[in-house]
């Protein structure tokens, strides 16, 4: 119920025809710009702290700019950057505005390659200087680079040490700056390699420049750059000479999809936005595979290249549960299955009392799982009806039949979010009091003192909104019991691959487990896990073990959930409260192709993830006890 931030969305477009083609067919040479806007707006869910775009012209004379960028901060950043681009054209006559040759020759952003980025910060760093794309400029066109990405690296310190060891001096200690310098350095080396080949061919002047731009191999650049990256990433780039690329991590943690026809090549973080923007069937859209790069040459020739050996695929399951748009055909089915998988545990919790239970959902992102839950409950109730009717024999009483057939799953819109109030109370001392009114409730939607209330959510991470708002406001309806149902398992571990949840103390599941250890006189387990974690410092990250698992090991999921209820239920709550979680196996059955579950299981796909959780636990203990 609390909003999770996740690192970013990307969009990349390469026009495969001259600008005149789009002016003639679509009535505007700005076809690429317009499609980029649509791709970014349709992925607005992936980033609301800032946005940026970059463009490269393939044809520009020396002395003319060919690489352009716009960036802005805030939730309205997409609109702002495109308005700023359009401001370059406001004084043009209608004839000039529809003259593709004139635009190509004289106007900024009248190019053939485009790249867009939506930002959510998961590192705590903010400001316009951290908004992608980043630029690295040079007098050689081929050495210019625009870079953006959806990523988090766990080994920034190692990469920083590596590039400073060869004499580079990054201006900031931030992962994107460091990666820009690293990829830029490898791009420089590749240009110099091809330069030497051109000289060996006897070429001079512009002949060398043209040779470089025709023979540069971005696969070499990416292979030598990315071999030491540890993290989840989709990195996109444009070079000044007109090449485009996107590379995905070997574990497939972060998502990317692409499409090509005779007019355009496009890549985005989410599949349905490509379907919507270009009106193409899902079958025509391809997934960029783990460790693979999409490479587009200056001439517009597209190819994929296996840059890094693919590892066991660990695609982020939170993308399916919460982050990605639910309009994707597979995500929609998976979220419905997540709701359906919860049905046995829900029935057990309510003691099969469907006649006195009302079902609803909070927030809207849980709506699809809610439909799946209802479908599963309907199936169960129909089976029960069949058995009851069969028990009546060959000559059933009509009244008895009517009673059986009249039974329905009771679903209601119990809570409605007040968007304006949510914005208003973002800060201030009275936040907690006002937070209780973020949701309005539908009075009369259940029978007070008689009915149970089941509310499904997509995830419970910190539990803040539950404690400050949800439980208290639902209790006003007078339910006998409140069941908070999560379509995802207990979030127990930090994420280091792009989700804004990096501190152990944030997780209500972790806090509950620690409280149980204290209550049961098992604090030695905390000390032991700390000591083992501390002893690992200095080991190669590949040898490290996630000892935080020992904090949870003594307890069942149900014991931890029960303690969470104690911690989250506000004083004065009249209804009994229970939390029901999705079992881990239920998640895997619902999303079989998205096995990345480290925030639930502690099984990190990369060594860097284990190193980071180790340090997070050490930090938690040392801050708590002021070591």
Locate the predicted segments by residue.
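Active-site proximal loops enriched in glycine and acidic residues that flank catalytic Cys/His/Asp
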Residues: 237, 248-249, 269-271, 298, ...
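Extended, hydrophobic alpha-helical segments in both membrane/secreted and soluble proteins
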Residues: 359, 366-373, 411, 421, ...
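Generic, well-ordered alpha-helical scaffold segments in large soluble proteins
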Residues: 162, 166, 182-186, 228, ...
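Short mixed-charge
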Residues: 96-101, 195-216, 379-408, 520-530, ...
């Amino acid at each position: 119920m609390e909003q999770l931030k996740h690192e970013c969305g990307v969009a990349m477009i390469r026009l495969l025809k001259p600008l005149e083609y789009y002016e003639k067919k679509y009535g505007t040479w700005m076809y690429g710009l317009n499609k980029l806007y649509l791709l970014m707006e349709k992925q607005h869910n992936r980033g609301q702290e800032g946005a940026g775009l970059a463009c490269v012209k393939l044809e520009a004379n020396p002395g003319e700019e060919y690489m352009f960028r716009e960036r802005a901060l805030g939730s309205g950043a997409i609109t702002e950057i495109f308005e700023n681009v359009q401001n370059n054209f406001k004084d043009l006559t209608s004839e000039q505005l529809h003259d593709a040759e004139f635009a190509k020759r004289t106007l900024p952003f009248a190019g053939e390659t485009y790249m867009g980025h939506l930002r959510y910060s998961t590192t705590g760093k903010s400001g316009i200087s951290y908004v992608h794309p980043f630029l690295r400029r040079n007098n050689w066109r081929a050495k210019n680079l625009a870079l953006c990405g959806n990523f988090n690296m766990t080994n920034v310190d190692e990469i920083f040490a590596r590039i400073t060891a060869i004499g580079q001096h990054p201006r900031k200690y931030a992962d994107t700056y460091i990666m820009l310098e690293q990829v830029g350095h490898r791009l420089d080396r590749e240009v110099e390699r091809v330069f030497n080949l051109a000289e060996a061919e006897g070429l001079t002047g512009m002949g060398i420049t043209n040779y470089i731009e025709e023979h540069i191999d971005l696969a070499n650049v990416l292979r030598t750059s990315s071999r030491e990256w540890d993290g989840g990433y989709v990195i996109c780039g444009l070079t000044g000479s007109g090449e485009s690329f996107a590379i995905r991590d070997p574990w497939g943690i972060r998502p990317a999809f692409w499409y090509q026809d005779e007019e355009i090549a496009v890549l985005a973080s989410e599949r349905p936005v490509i379907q919507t923007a270009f009106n193409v069937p899902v079958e025509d859209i391809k997934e960029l595979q783990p460790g693979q790069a999409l490479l587009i040459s200056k001439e517009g020739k597209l190819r994929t290249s296996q840059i890094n050996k693919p590892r066991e695929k660990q695609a982020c399951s939170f993308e399916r549960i919460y982050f990605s748009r639910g309009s994707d055909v597979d995500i929609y089915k998976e979220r419905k299955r997540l709701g359906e998988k919860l049905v046995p545990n829900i029935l057990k919790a309510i003691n099969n009392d469907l006649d006195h239970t009302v079902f609803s959902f909070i927030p809207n992102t849980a709506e699809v799982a809610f439909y799946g839950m209802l479908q599963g409950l309907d199936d169960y109730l129909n089976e029960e009806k069949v058995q009851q009717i069969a028990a009546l024999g060959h000559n059933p009483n009509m009244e008895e039949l009517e009673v059986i057939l009249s039974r329905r799953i009771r679903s209601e819109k119990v809570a409605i979010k007040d968007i304006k109030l949510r914005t208003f109370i973002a800060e201030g001392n009275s936040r907690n009091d006002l937070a209780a009114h973020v949701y309005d409730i539908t009075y009369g939607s259940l029978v007070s003192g008689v009915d149970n209330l089941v509310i499904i959510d997509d995830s419970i991470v910190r539990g803040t909104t539950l404690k400050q708002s949800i439980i208290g406001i639902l209790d006003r309806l007078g339910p006998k019991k409140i069941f908070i149902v999560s379509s995802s398992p207990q979030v127990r571990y930090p994420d280091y691959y792009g989700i804004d949840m990096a501190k152990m103390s944030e997780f209500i599941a972790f806090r509950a487990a620690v409280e149980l250890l204290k209550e049961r006189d098992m604090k030695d387990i905390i000390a032991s896990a700390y000591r083992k974690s501390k002893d690992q410092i200095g080991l190669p990250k590949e040898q490290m073990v996630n000892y935080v698992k020992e904090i949870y090991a003594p307890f069942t999921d149900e014991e931890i959930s029960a303690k969470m209820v104690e911690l989250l239920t506000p004083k004065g709550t009249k209804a009994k409260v229970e939390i029901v979680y999705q079992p881990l196996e239920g998640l895997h059955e619902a999303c079989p192709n998205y096995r990345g579950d480290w925030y639930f299981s502690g099984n990190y796909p990369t060594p860097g993830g284990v190193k980071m959780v180790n340090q997070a636990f050490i930090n938690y203990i040392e801050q708590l006890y002021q070591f």
